[in-house]
């Protein structure tokens, strides 16, 4: 059985554009720009954009990740200003998206335009132990390219 997360809609305009999973296999829900008017984001500029949606996950085993929409990034250079947004389970309030225009042209963001996607993910919190060394593994301390190419 899948958990259901209660998401509050703050902007009545979303009534006709509720976030929805596009397919049964979709991981993310699209978030929209809940702005009153068109917003122009200049090259190199970052703007905070309201989504009109409030969330309180309440379960410490869950978090929400805000991710860019691939088409906006590839076609227009519009990505998230913080690259990935993280919504902790104890946050209560409206979600905002930090939108960064890394492109060369001004970008006109229209009201209710899809700007990002949200994925709910499980969270496992780490505990830390002071040690003198690790148990040996085949890989060892190799990193950054140590397993080769191809």
Curated annotation (Swiss-Prot):
Which enzyme class?
Answer: hydrolase
Q: Which GO terms describe its biological process?
A: dUMP biosynthetic process; dUTP catabolic process
CDD domains hit by this protein: trimeric_dUTPase
What start-end ranges are recorded for coiled-coil regions in this protein?
Answer: none
Pfam families per record = dUTPase (PF00692)
In what pathway does it function? Pyrimidine metabolism; dUMP biosynthesis; dUMP from dCTP (dUTP route): step 2/2
Could you say which residues bind substrate here?
A: 69-71, 82, 86-88
Superkingdom of the source species: Bacteria
Reaction(s) the record says it catalyses: dUTP + H2O = dUMP + diphosphate + H(+)
Can the keyword Magnesium be found in this entry's annotation?
Answer: yes
The terms under GO molecular function for this entry are: dUTP diphosphatase activity; magnesium ion binding
Write down the InterPro entries for this protein, in alphabetical order. Answer: dUTPase, dUTPase-like, dUTPase-like_sf, dUTPase_trimeric
Keywords, sorted A to Z: Hydrolase, Magnesium, Metal-binding, Nucleotide metabolism
Which HAMAP family does the entry mention? Answer: dUTPase_bact
Task: Give the family, as the similarity comment puts it.
Answer: Belongs to the dUTPase family.
Q: What does this protein do?
A: This enzyme is involved in nucleotide metabolism: it produces dUMP, the immediate precursor of thymidine nucleotides and it decreases the intracellular concentration of dUTP so that uracil cannot be incorporated into DNA.
From the Swiss-Prot or TrEMBL record, give the protein name. Deoxyuridine 5'-triphosphate nucleotidohydrolase
The uppermost taxa in this organism's lineage are: Bacteria, Pseudomonadati, Pseudomonadota, Betaproteobacteria, Neisseriales
Q: What gene does this protein come from?
A: dut
């Amino acid at each position: 059985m899948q958990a259901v997360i209660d998401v509050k809609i703050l902007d009545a305009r979303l009534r006709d554009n509720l976030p929805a999973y596009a397919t049964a296999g979709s991981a993310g829900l699209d978030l929209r720009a809940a702005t009153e008017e068109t917003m122009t984001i200049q090259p190199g500029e970052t703007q905070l954009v309201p989504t009109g949606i409030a969330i309180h996950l309440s379960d410490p085993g869950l978090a929400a990740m805000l991710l860019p929409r691939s088409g906006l990034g590839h076609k227009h250079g519009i990505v998230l200003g913080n690259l990935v947004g993280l919504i902790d389970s104890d946050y209560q309030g409206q979600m905002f998206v930090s939108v960064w225009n890394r492109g060369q042209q001004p970008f006109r963001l229209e009201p209710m335009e899809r700007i990002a996607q949200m994925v709910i993910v499980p969270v496992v919190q780490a505990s830390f132990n002071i040690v003198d060394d690790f148990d040996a593994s085949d890989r060892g301390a190799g990193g950054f390219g140590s397993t080769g190419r191809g």
